[in-house]
C-alpha cells in the first residue's frame, strides 16, 4: 500500500514541471472596461477601471477534519477607492450619479461577498442588460 502511494506521488511530481510551464498569471492589477447602467437612466456607459485578476495558490486537503478547514483563496482587492460617474439622461427624481471601484492593490484572500463577485462564472464586466433584445 505504501509503495503504491509513493509511486503515485512520484508520478504526480514528475508532472510538476509541465504544469509550471503553463504559467498562470498571478493575482495582479488589470485594466478593464466595465459597463455602468442604472434604472431610470438611459443607455449603457462603458468606463475604464482597474480590477484584480489572476491565480491564487490554494490547498484542498484529502483528509478533512474540523481542524483543517479548506479555505479557497481568490484574487481580491487590497486597497481601492471609488470613482463617480454621472449619467447624462435620467428621469426626474432619479439620482444620476453611480460609483464604481478602482483597485489600487490586489491580494489573495477569502472572497468578501460584500465587495466581490464570488460566483464560479459570472457575467463579463462589460456586459450591458440594455444589449439584450426585449421580446413581448
UniProtKB/Swiss-Prot annotation:
Disulfide pairings: 27-75, 41-90, 44-128, 52-106, 56-108, 111-118
Keywords, alphabetical: Disulfide bond, Glycoprotein, Hormone, Secreted, Signal
Places the protein is found: Secreted
Signal peptide per UniProt: 1-21
GO terms under biological process: G protein-coupled receptor signaling pathway; ovulation
Origin superkingdom: Eukaryota
Gene Ontology cellular-component annotations: cytoplasm; extracellular space
UniProt keyword annotation of Transferase present: no
Matching InterPro entries: Cystine-knot_cytokine, Glyco_hormone_CN, Gonadotropin_bsu, Gonadotropin_bsu_CS
Sugar-bearing residue positions: 31
An MF annotation (GO) of this entry: hormone activity
Pfam families: Cys_knot
SUPFAM superfamilies referenced in this protein's UniProt entry, alphabetically: Cystine-knot cytokines
Quaternary organization: Heterodimer of an alpha and a beta chain.
PANTHER family cross-referenced by the UniProt entry: GLYCOPROTEIN HORMONE BETA CHAIN, LUTROPIN SUBUNIT BETA
Family membership: Belongs to the glycoprotein hormones subunit beta family.
Role played: Involved in gametogenesis and steroidogenesis.
Record's protein name: Gonadotropin subunit beta-2
Gene it is expressed from: cgbb
Amino acid at each position: 500500500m505504501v509503495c503504491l502511494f509513493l509511486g503515485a506521488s512520484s508520478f504526480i511530481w514528475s508532472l510538476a514541471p509541465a504544469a509550471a510551464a503553463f504559467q498562470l498569471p498571478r493575482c495582479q492589477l488589470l485594466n478593464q472596461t466595465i459597463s455602468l447602467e442604472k434604472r431610470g437612466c438611459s443607455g449603457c456607459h462603458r468606463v475604464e477601471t482597474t480590477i484584480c485578476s489572476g491565480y491564487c495558490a490554494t490547498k484542498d486537503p484529502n483528509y478533512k477534519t474540523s481542524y483543517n478547514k479548506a479555505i479557497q483563496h481568490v484574487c481580491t482587492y487590497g486597497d481601492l477607492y471609488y470613482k463617480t460617474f454621472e449619467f447624462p439622461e435620467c428621469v426626474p427624481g432619479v439620482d444620476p450619479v453611480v460609483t464604481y471601484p478602482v483597485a489600487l492593490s490586489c491580494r489573495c484572500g477569502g472572497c468578501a461577498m460584500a465587495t466581490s463577485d464570488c460566483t464560479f462564472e459570472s457575467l463579463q464586466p462589460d456586459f450591458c442588460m440594455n444589449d439584450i433584445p426585449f421580446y413581448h
